[in-house]
Amino acid sequence: MNKSEPHGAQGFDIVINGEDRLFAELEVSAIASAGFYKESYPEDTVQIRARVDNKLRNVLGYARLE
């Protein structure tokens, strides 16, 4: 998924092992989805990227960000 797709520059990408895998329109949804994934697969690297500023944040677990 990239910024030229229908979601445009709004929302949040959920990045798993360096690859954009999921999308959420709301930050709270991105945090919940990424946290659930991280709890299920703790060995994977899970991050949330805000499309507005392209900033990446690491997900440490359910509702926990670095």
Task: Name each model feature, range by range.
Residues 21-22, 57:
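Short, isolated positions in well-ordered beta-strands
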